[in-house]
Amino acid sequence: MHQFTKDYYEDGVRKHISGYEDYKWMPTRSIPEALDIQNHFEFKTCVDYGCAKGFLVNALRIIGCDAWGEDISEYAVQNCHPNVRDYVSLPNDKFYDLLICKDVLEHVEVEDIPSVLKNFKKKSNQFFFVIPLGDNDRFRIREYEVDVTHVTKKDEEWWIKMFESQGMELVKFSYSLGSIKEKWIKPHPHGNGFFILRTSEC
């Protein structure tokens, strides 16, 4: 099984295991994304779950948000942006107003998704998921097939049913949100799903 190691983030293209190559901070991408999140959601605290090196966390903090990051990759956490070393960690039990999960759930095996979502409900009651969409176990955006850890390739209806089965209420679904993943939207307008959800108990 491939893990999220140094090779995954720094040499993934050459080694044919991911789309990453010398994964670095790009403020021209991360700060507009952070502003879009700030403008679309009401929250005091937020967590980027699956934050990798914490670039979105850094951007959110730059614009004044109380943002945190969690990731299962020890390499990513240990090599996070220096500005957020005190704010990025391995998964923990903290609770936040908003849980952001961008390009993460496709890495989770189908049978494990319910337990992951149950864990998310312990961490927040408001969720923003960005997920590459697929049909017949193929991503609509073929470039996403490069990543060997991309194992779940489902369409928007499948995801909505999954979320609802775990007690999450769909607030809004769309194929875009501001500048987030904008380079993919023009060539692939239905390639990514943007899901805004809350717990049914809210």
How should these model regions be labeled?
Residues S124-G134:
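Conserved beta-strand signature within the Rossmann-like core of class I S-adenosyl-L-methionine
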Residues D137-E143:
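A short acidic, helix-capping loop that chelates divalent metal ions and anchors anionic groups
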Residues K102-H107:
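Short catalytic micro-motifs in class I SAM-dependent methyltransferases
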Residues N119-K123:
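Conserved helix-to-beta-strand junction in the class I
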Residues M162, Q166-M168:
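A structural motif corresponding to the C-terminal end of an alpha-helix
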Residues M1-I100, E111-K118, G134, V146-W158, ...:
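Conserved N-terminal segment of class I S-adenosyl-L-methionine
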